[in-house]
Amino acid sequence: MKIIDWNQLDTAAQAQTLTRPAQTIATQTREAVAALIEQVRRGGDTALRDITARLDGVDLATFEVTAAELAAAATAVAPELQHAMQTAAARIEAFHRAGMTNGYRVETAPGVVCERLVRPIARVGLYVPAGSAPLFSTALMLGVPARLAGCREVVLCTPPSKDGRANPAVLLAARLTGVTRVFTLGGAQAIAAMAYGTASVPTCDKVFGPGNSFVTEAKQQLAQAGVVAIDMPAGPSEVLVIADAAANPAFIAADLLSQAEHGPDSQVLLLSDSDALMTAVQTALALQLQQLSRAEIARQALAQSRLIKVATLETAFDISNRYAPEHLILALRQPRAWLHRVAAAGSVFLGDYTPEALGDYCSGTNHVLPTGGAARAYSGVSVSSFQNMISVQAASRSGIAEIGDCALTLARAEGLDAHANAVALRMGTVP
């Protein structure tokens, strides 16, 4: 990673510096996903068996994990990992429970009462990937808020291993969080199955979870077609670090690499006003890379990442808000004093001893976050992601007499005579 001096760049070069790795979906991928979706829509379970055999190399008679298999999963997971998962789930629940939205009721005028009701989405689908490694942590991050929201049915799909079984840790996470049904299905076909429903897989109202380019494309296509709602735009993982001269370069290098190892299309950025720190981070990166099992993946990600020298930390925050990172680390001496400058980020990590990896696993916050700049308008998954907000209003005879003239004036100004008539008829019955 080379050091770039922000002040030496013109406007076009600055924009180019903040450009993320090209995320254009190849026409071939888009067409392949569309074909898979259509195959599942038309063929249901039969199509799912054919696709699973072709893409996963597994012949499955049934997709659903039995209650006995779920119960047995705990015996296949090491006690230390079980304890860690239980601890993480408890912290995730504590954080998400504290932020739950309550309904409210307010009288907006004499005789006019407006309310907001909070209702769970009836049936939700969770996707837990298992590419280079089964992400049982994602099952915790999605399953806990779904349970707190009160969803009647929570469906989870995760790819089968070569023996046709789901990963035991994923099954344990599903059991810990109260997931109601689990299916060994992966890829775009799993998303299509939850969106359209099959004889085995129930139709879901909303689908959550990360995945590869096929999963992401399937979610986008099905959402754009109005078939199913999705959690948020998805994309490769990213982190932006703002650091001062006193930050620990080894810590920063470790945080950058923890994101870079996700995939070659991940992006990491370091912004600092200290040349010495950035040089030290370069050295630390080279040393730590030698010890990583996924070093080659991390190197590819670092090749399209940036070390950006800024004149002031204020400028660093302006750049960060423009970039809107998924993860933002403030490696500063008084990080909380700078928090008011953060306007767009998925999740923020304060100080030298809050690595992003804590948020990935067990601090309690959710790691399913907006990427690709979507943090300017989207938030990470929360309990409210699994709920609907329903508005209610009730006007008495005196209430419509109180506000009816306002409605008549507005309706007539918009030329909507039927709207005006619906109010006027009622006002005519008020003594």
UniProtKB/Swiss-Prot annotation:
InterPro entries referenced in this protein's UniProt entry, alphabetically: Ald_DH/histidinol_DH (IPR016161), Histidinol_DH_CS (IPR001692), Histidinol_DH_monofunct (IPR022695), Hstdl_DH (IPR012131)
Residues binding NAD(+), per UniProt: 127, 189, 212
Annotated residues for binding of Zn(2+): 259, 262, 360, 419
Binding site for substrate: 237, 259, 262, 327, 360, 414, 419
EC top class, as a word: oxidoreductase
Note accompanying the cofactor annotation: Binds 1 zinc ion per subunit.
Extent of the signal sequence: none
Pathway where this protein functions: Amino-acid biosynthesis; L-histidine biosynthesis; L-histidine from 5-phospho-alpha-D-ribose 1-diphosphate: step 9/9
GO BP terms, alphabetized: L-histidine biosynthetic process
This enzyme's EC code(s): 1.1.1.23
Keyword DNA repair listed: no
GO cellular component terms listed in the entry, alphabetical order: cytosol
Cofactor needs: Zn(2+)
Pfam families listed in its UniProt record: Histidinol_dh (PF00815)
Reactions the enzyme catalyzes: L-histidinol + 2 NAD(+) + H2O = L-histidine + 2 NADH + 3 H(+)
Any one GO molecular-function label of the UniProt entry: zinc ion binding
UniProt family annotation: Belongs to the histidinol dehydrogenase family.
Protein purpose: Catalyzes the sequential NAD-dependent oxidations of L-histidinol to L-histidinaldehyde and then to L-histidine.
Protein name: Histidinol dehydrogenase
Organism from which the protein derives: Xylella fastidiosa (strain 9a5c)
Gene giving rise to this polypeptide: hisD
